[in-house]
Structures are given as structure tokens and as C-alpha cells.
């Protein structure tokens, strides 16, 4: 069986007040992704800050266990970057590419992605076109 490709999108400070969660704010592209993928309706933030929440999603550990008790740009870091899901995916044969911001390390190289596509800022108008370009050019599978 061919392993499925995985596209992990994590928007910054979006919240749940968007269309897929039953609210009136139209987000047709997010709705389409929710219709065709996975939508988590019974999830919660593991930490009160961006870095701690992201680190929990990417390691499967609470912030007090993974070390990300504050913001990465304020000096907090993971205890062990080998716990990042990227390493688990690589061991399963996946290729990983980062487009935009991960916000669990000031040095993106420590995360372990196979490729990092740098954009000047993490705003959607810069990140989305780069993501579309990478996907259209094609990636070795699985990704």
C-alpha cells in the first residue's frame, strides 16, 4: 500500500471562529480542506502561547515535558528536537518541507526538515504562493 501524502497546515492565531466550525466567517479554502481531510472538533490548546501549543502538536508532549514553556523568540526551546514529528515521519520514509514559520526554534535548521523554503515574513500572502509553487512543481513521494 502506498503511504498517503501528508499536508500539515498550521495557521497562526486563527482560532476556531471560521466556517468549518460552524461560524459565519467564510473561509472557503479552509472549508474545502476540512471537507477533504481531517477536522479536529474536540481539541484544545496545550499551552497559552504559540510556541508551546505548536511544540505540543509537533512532539505529542505537553510544554512542561517538551521544554517549550514560553516563546521560541524569547529563548525557549525544545529539550530534544529529535522528538519533533519530522523525525518520526522521516523514519517512515517521508520527505518533509517547511514553508513559512514553525515557531518552535529560532534556528530552523535544528528542526530537521529536508528542505526549508524561506519567506520574508509569515503572512499568508507570502507563504501561500510559495506553498502552491512547491506543490505544483511536485515533490518526491511520499511527502
Named regions from a protein language model:
Residues 1-143:
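Formylglycine-dependent sulfatase
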Amino acid at each position: 500500500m502506498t503511504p498517503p501524502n501528508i499536508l500539515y497546515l498550521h495557521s497562526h492565531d486563527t482560532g476556531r471562529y471560521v466556517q468549518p466550525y460552524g461560524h459565519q466567517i467564510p473561509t472557503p479554502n479552509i472549508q474545502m480542506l476540512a471537507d477533504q481531510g481531517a477536522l479536529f472538533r474536540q481539541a484544545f490548546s496545550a499551552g497559552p502561547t504559540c510556541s508551546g501549543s505548536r511544540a505540543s502538536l509537533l512532539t505529542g508532549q505537553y510544554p512542561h515535558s517538551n521544554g517549550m514553556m514560553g516563546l521560541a523568540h524569547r529563548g525557549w526551546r525544545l529539550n530534544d528536537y529529535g522528538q519533533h514529528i519530522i523525525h518520526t515521519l522521516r523514519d517512515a520514509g517521508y520527505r518533509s518541507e517547511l514553508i513559512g514559520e514553525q515557531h518552535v526554534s529560532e534556528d530552523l535548521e535544528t528542526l530537521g526538515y529536508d528542505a526549508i523554503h524561506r519567506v520574508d515574513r509569515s503572512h499568508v500572502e507570502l507563504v501561500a504562493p510559495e506553498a502552491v509553487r512547491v506543490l505544483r512543481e511536485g515533490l518526491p513521494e511520499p511527502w
